[in-house]
Amino acid sequence: MLKFKKMGSDKVPLLLVTANVGSIFEEPTTMLPIWTSEFLAAVARMDPKFIALHLQEVGGKTYEKSMQYVRDFVQRLCDCPELRLYDKIRIYLDEDFSSPEKFTALGNMYFAHSTLTDLKIWDFELKSYVDVVGREVNSGNIEKVTTKEKAKFPQQFFPECKWSRKGFLRTRWSIRNTAVEFVNIHLFHDASNLLAMEPFPSVYCRSRRRALRHTLRHLHSDVNAAPYFIFGDFNFRTDTGGVVKKVTEELTACRLQNGTNTESSKLQFRSKSDDRIVLTVAKKEFSHVDHQKIFREPWLQRFDRELEALRPHLYEFPVKFPPTYPFEEDIHLPTHYMKTRCPSWCDRVLLSQSARLLLQHNERPDNRHLHSSRNSDSDASPNRRKLVRNQSEGSPKSGETSAELRRLVDHPTRRRSEYGMIGDTACMGDHK
C-alpha cells in the first residue's frame, strides 16, 4: 500500500494496493468479508481520491467454481457505502479460463472520487486519452477491451512449470494532466524449497528476473510511455540458501530420502547438544522450531535480494513491515506463517525512476538516494512525498527538467507517504 498525501489543489492522494486473493476465494464465505472489511477500513482511514487495486489469482485455483463469488465481490465493492463518493470506476477482470494461452487471472480495479475531475484513461488502440465517466466493468474475455494492455509471459520464461497464469495487466491514466501508468504483475513462484537452496540467484529467481526485465523493456519501448507504478505479486523470495546457512551455523545436517524418490527427500538440521530438530527443509516444507519469531527479525531483510539487479531502474520505499507470505489461512491464526516456505516479501509496490520524480521529497534527490540499498541511512529516514505534474517516461536530457518540477522537488511537504500492510492482524489469506 502506498499513499501520496494531498498538498494543494493540483495534488492527488493515491492509494495503491496489491493483493493475491487466490486463497480468499477458496474460503469465500469466511474470508471475503474479512478481506473486504479491512480494505474498506483502510480507504476510510486514508481518504484517498484515487484508488488502484491490483489483484492476482482472482477466483482462486478453481475459477469455474468461483465466478459467482467474484461477481458478488465486485458488486459489493462497487455498491458499498464506503465507496459511494467514488463515482468513476474502471474494472478489468481477466476471467476467460477457457483460453489457457491467454488467461492470467489478473484483476485491476480503479476508483476515482467525485471531486477528482479531468480524469482520462489511455486507449491503446486509438493511441489517445478518453474521458472517464461513470462505472465500467470489463469481465470475462477482455481481449478486445482497448483501454488496457494485457500479456501473458511466454512459457519458456518458466520452463520448470508445465502451465502458468503469470503475466501483466497495464493501464495508463491522465490524472489532472499528470500521465501515469499502473501495471499489475504476477511472477512465478518457487516450486521446490530444495531447488531454491542453490546459490543465489536460484533458477526461480532467474526466471522471475527474466520476466520482469521483459516487462520493463516493453514498457520503456512504448513511444507513448509514461512514468509507471508496477505493483503486484512479484513472488520475490529471500535467498533461501543464505537463510538456511544463517540459521544452521551451529547445527548438524542430514538428508532423509525414501529410496530413489528425490521428490520426497528432506533435509534436517539438528542441535549438536541435544539432537533436537531445529530446521526441516523439503520440497514444500520449511519449518523452524521458532518459526513465528525468527523470520520477523531484522536480519532476514539482508537476504531479500531479488531487486538488487534492477535497482537502477526501479525504486521502492523502505520496507518496514514483516514478510507478506505465506500466512496461515486460518482466522484464528491471522499473524502466523505457514511452515511451507521461508517467509518472504512477495507483494511489492515499485516505481520507475521517472515516477519517483512525481513525488516531492524533503531533500534534493541524487544518485545516492536513487540507488541506495534498503538499509542505508537515506532509506531509513522517512522522506516525505507528494504527486506532482510529470514528464513522459524515458531519460530526460540534462537541464530539461522543468522549473516547476525543480521548485516542487526543492520544497518539503507537510505529510508523508505510507508503505505497509492492510489487515496486518486479520486473516487476509496467505498473502498480505
Where would I find each of the regions flagged by the language model?
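N-terminal, active-site-proximal structural segment of metallo-dependent hydrolase catalytic domains
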Residues: 1-109, 116-118, 140-159, 169, ...
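Core residues of folded domains in eukaryotic genome-function proteins
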Residues: 10-17, 46-51, 105-107, 120, ...
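Conserved beta-strand elements of beta-rich interaction domains across eukaryotes
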Residues: 21-24, 57-60, 78, 99-104, ...
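Short coil/turn segments at secondary-structure boundaries
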Residues: 28-33, 64-68, 122-126, 184-187, ...
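Amphipathic alpha-helical scaffolding segments
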Residues: 33-38, 68-79, 125-136, 187-189, ...
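Metal-dependent phosphoester-hydrolase catalytic domains
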Residues: 89, 128, 154-156, 162-163, ...
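Eukaryotic regulatory low-complexity N-terminal regions enriched in Ser/Thr, Pro, acidic
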Residues: 117-119, 126-127, 134, 162
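His/acidic metal-ligating clusters that form di-metal
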Residues: 181, 208-230
